[in-house]
Amino acid sequence: MIAPDSQRLFGSFDEQFKDLKLDSVDTENNNTHGVSTILDSSPASVNNNTNGAVAASVNTVPGSTFRSNTPLLGGRHPLSRTSSLIDSIGIQRAASPFSSMKEPFIPQSSGVMSSSFWHGDHPESRVSTPVQQHPLLQRNESSSSFSYAANLGVNLSTHSLAVDITPLSTPTAAQSHVNLFPSSDIPPNMSMNGMSQLPAPVSVESSWRYIDTQGQIHGPFTTQMMSQWYIGGYFASTLQISRLGSTPETLGINDIFITLGELMTKLEKYDTDPFTTFDKLHVQTTSSDSINLNLAPYASGVAATGTIKATENDIFKPLTHDNIWDMDGGTTSKGVDIKLASATTISQTDESHKQEYKSTTMLEKGKKEKSESVAKALLDEQEKRNRELKRKEEARLSKKQKQKEDDLLKKQKEQKEQKEKEALEAEKQKKSEKTKKDTQTQTEGFKTSKDLPSLNSSSANPAPWASKVKVNNAIETSIKNGVSSTGKKKGEPLGLQQRNSKEEKQKEELKSVLNWANKSSLPSNQTIDIKSQFQKSPKGMKESSPLKELEDPNFIEEQKKLWEKVQSSSKQVKSTSSASTTTSSWTTVTSKGKAPIGTVVSPYSKTNTSLNSSLTAKTSTTSTTTTFASMNNVSPRQEFIKWCKSQMKLNSGITNNNVLELLLSLPTGPESKELIQETIYANSDVMDGRRFATEFIKRRVACEKQGDDPLSWNEALALSGNDDDGWEFQVVSKKKGRKH
């Protein structure tokens, strides 16, 4: 069926198109202010019609006409059919703003214009307008009218246009303006209401690691590889896996090794691939976050409402079917105002977003304040605990310091009390000793005054010159000290220090007495009247032997026997006087000869060693010469001292007794060898100190092992005398012929 008025339709379309071209040129020359049109650049927005549209294209070749027939029609008018309701059943009238727009399928052939026509810049079709245009909702590509129009093509060789002259429905104003704007002016990121399109979900592929049965870590591997191995049955539910924390995830398994069964439990998926399922959950989380981020810039409702109102004012007035196609009698057109969204709805949405944003901000602020308050409370509690610990520590230290001070004071107090007690005891002891000493001296003096005649009953015949001899004062002092020391030994003992000092003093006095006796010995028949001496010195009467010793009959008998021995030994002095010329005061010394030391026998027996030395001093002073002459035995210590003096060749001005006294004070062990050696080298230039020290220690040890010597070292040294003057040194020259 041929549609009526087809020639008129083409003629009217040509005229209308020329008018539109002129209008567009005039508009470009006016340069009116307006907002540039922002449309979607996809070619699908150019050719889709809601109720069916005429697919028409303008041939840019000169000389083309709309009234020429195509070669395919053979000079006939193109067939057309009336629209039917079936064509529009199941067709989506408007495309979803959330679905991606696709370009229409246009068959490419040598007889059909290329797709560059759809995207080309046609000056005659560009219309500059200050009015901002809204993008149209896209139509589903399954429309029958779109398919029918798309199947029509333009034969470029004949410059003819195939047009569906029977539209399915009356075109709208928006459909009439689709081909007037090229797709190059439409930005690709615009969507309706001036808001940017939502980004497509970004697919994230995770990286995984796993630990094998030997404990070695392998990876990282992608989700695809892990899924293939899982599907192949290589992974057990006990396999330990870990996801690399390159991107955030919702399950909290980044960089943590968990078993595959635990991952499936967290995902609550037991019959699917856990790796792919995890990535899907992760992508959904990322997409929801991107939606929230895209809505955030439009939280202000004032700006969005102003933009929508400006768009409503600047939109083109819709063009009707009559003023485009200039058709007589037919269908009437209705003006359609395109409003993509209601301002009220948008403002309400913006307000809701604003309220949500405010509520979120308040919630975050409340959480922040609460966390700060909790942190502050924790800090205060920690500081309080630290202060309490510090206070306890200081209290403990102060208590410990106080206890130390108390202990120190207590100790000092005890020491002070102990010293005071010791001082009181010492003072009491001194007082008691003094009183006892006074009483003893009084009683001893009284008893000795009665017993003195008995001591002088058996005196020897005095010499003619006995009355002229004056006794040295040292004899009297030695007798007094001997008597007093005897009384003290029988009484309470003195301190160790006092006893030692008195013994040393007594030995020195005895030494002086013995030396005097050796060098100035009296004749054999000379005696000393002890009675007259005691009468001259009344003090000696008080200091006599103790009462018990004088009353003892055995003591008196022993003294008598000793006195008889002294008298009997005086007869032998005549025979030995020639041998002891150096000790007699009547001989003349003609040369420095070595003086022989007379044999000295102790007047004490072994049973009488406990007696006081003062009594011996008495007997020895009464007859000193006869006593020494009567001694037949020689003490081992005297022999040792004699050997020492024979070996010692000291420097001038140094006496043998002083050096021997020092050497005898040292111990007998080998530790004294070096000291003896150094002493000899210091006091002699010719002696071999090393050899002398060795022989000295050897002989001394042998002497002390005998144990039957009644004399001590000091007594033996005192009896040996000081015969340093008898030494005579002679320098011996080296003999000729001797090498050594």
UniProtKB/Swiss-Prot annotation:
Keywords: Coiled coil, Cytoplasm, Phosphoprotein. SUPFAM superfamilies: GYF domain. Residues 369-440 form a coiled coil. Residues 364-439, 500-510 have a biased composition (Basic and acidic residues). The modification Phosphoserine is found at residues 12, 96, 545, 602. Residues 346-510, 523-548, 567-592 are annotated as: Disordered. It is found in: Cytoplasm. Residues 474-486, 523-536 have a biased composition (Polar residues). Residues 452-467 have a biased composition (Low complexity). GO terms for cellular component: cytoplasm; cytosol; endoplasmic reticulum membrane; nucleus. One of its GO terms (biological process) is protein-containing complex disassembly. Interacts with EAP1 and MSL5 (via the GYP domain). Belongs to the SMY2/mpd2 family. Present with 486 molecules/cell in log phase SD medium. This is Protein SMY2. It comes from Saccharomyces cerevisiae (strain ATCC 204508 / S288c). The gene is SMY2.
